[in-house]
Swiss-Prot record:
Known partners and oligomeric status: Homotrimer; associates with NifD.
Keywords, comma-separated and alphabetical: Nitrogen fixation
Stored InterPro entries: NifW
Protein name: Nitrogenase-stabilizing/protective protein NifW
Organism of origin: Mesorhizobium japonicum (strain LMG 29417 / CECT 9101 / MAFF 303099) (Mesorhizobium loti (strain MAFF 303099))
Gene field: nifW
Length: 127
């Protein structure tokens, strides 16, 4: 496994949070934060990585910190999020609501009624 930060490079830390907010593509986040990545991992997990990075960033308090410290923390959160999905699948982490709600390892709840497709076909005389 290739670490995403094995080939990290120096970055421009000026007003880093505002610059990150203006980005849209996952590749842009890695470029701005100076982190290399495996395109195969990013192609499969890009949305999951960015969502997890956002969750990690939300836990941080950047108030009054210098740009260099903020940039280092932002870089660390992206590296951490990337590693989460470089070592396991998006289904393992389930960062999105739709995946959390449909976890096959969780028992079905009683508030959802399951109707087998076969019973619907029988009702219409089709089998």
């Amino acid at each position: 496994m290739r670490s995403c930060f094995a080939e990290s490079r120096a970055i421009d830390v000026t007003d880093i949070l505002a610059r990150l907010k203006s980005l849209s593509a996952a590749e842009e986040f890695f470029a701005v934060l100076g982190i290399s990545y495996d395109p195969r991992v990013l192609n499969v997990s890009r949305l999951h990585i960015l969502k997890r990075m956002g969750q990690y960033l939300a836990e941080e308090d950047f108030a009054g910190l210098p740009d260099g410290v903020i940039a280092a923390r932002a870089r660390a959160t992206l590296e951490r999020a990337y590693e989460d999905f470089a070592t396991s699948s998006p289904l393992t982490h389930r960062v999105f609501k739709v995946l959390k709600e449909h976890d096959p390892d969780k028992p079905a709840t009683r508030d959802h009624t399951f109707v087998p497709f076969e019973s619907i076909l029988r009702r219409f005389g089709t089998e």
